[in-house]
Regions:
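Residues lining hydrophobic/aromatic ligand-binding pockets adjacent to catalytic sites
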Residues: 1-230
Length: 230
């Protein structure tokens, strides 16, 4: 069984869903420490003024928290601003009408926990991209550890024989320990597709909403990479 995982990011990029497409079970790493310098409460979209960050404000607890305990600071009318930015940026996109209702409804709700907002969006995006994969919340496995040891413990709890990692895993995964437990580690080979965009020259590595509104969510990868099971 191929297991992959990632933190539950806000409006994730296309590579997040590419990894999901290749695995059998996808782990949502909701129990790792929140990082404001990452993409857990922010992401990038393309506007007529260039690339812009959309950031969900969070309450500062004064101590490190796991992602699933982070609360949203409902100040500054952030949700309406995010909705207006999406609308102004993409209302001329070919597939705006098809998907915009979901985002309008999402931003009309009041959210308390960041994990609830992010998972609502992730599940909606999975539906639009026609990705049907079981999701497992890391917090539900009741295993402990950090970094490589946590990933290994989670894989063992789920019965993985292949661990699919993003390229960042090369910096921290102890591949030898995985091999000792009978788990093969492979790394995602994701080539960002070039597609028709609005607002000038092509910009890669944006939130997947750019891809969705511009292409309709057509599948960028036609099948699992055979090398994962070789």
């Amino acid at each position: 069984m191929i297991v992959a995982g990632h933190q539950p990011n806000y409006l994730p990029w296309l590579g997040f869903f590419d990894k999901m497409l290749q695995c059998d079970v996808f782990l949502i790493a909701d129990n790792v420490q929140f990082s404001a310098r990452n993409f857990q409460n922010r992401n990038k979209v393309k506007t007529f003024d260039g690339v812009r960050w959309l950031t969900v404000p969070i309450e500062h607890a004064g101590k490190p928290l796991p992602i699933n305990e982070v609360r949203i600071a409902n100040v500054g009318n952030w949700a309406r601003k995010h909705w207006v930015t999406l609308k102004c940026s993409y209302n001329q996109a070919p597939f705006w009408e098809k998907y915009s209702d979901f985002f309008e409804q999402t931003y009309s709700q009041e959210w308390t926990m960041l994990i609830d907002l992010n998972m609502h969006i992730i599940r909606g995006l999975m539906r639009f991209l026609k990705i049907e994969k079981p999701l497992v919340m890391g917090s539900s496995l009741r295993v402990s550890g950090i970094g490589s040891e946590l990933a290994l413990a989670q894989d063992k709890a789920m019965g993985a024989d292949i661990h699919l990692s993003g390229i960042g895993g090369r910096d921290y995964l102890n591949i030898k320990r995985f091999e000792e437990e009978g788990i093969k580690v492979v790394f995602q080979d994701f080539q960002y597709p070039v597609y028709p965009q609005l607002h000038g020259e092509f910009v890669p590595n944006l939130s997947v909403v750019d891809y969705l509104f511009c292409t309709g969510g057509k599948i960028w990868r036609t099948e699992k990479q055979a090398t994962l099971r070789s």
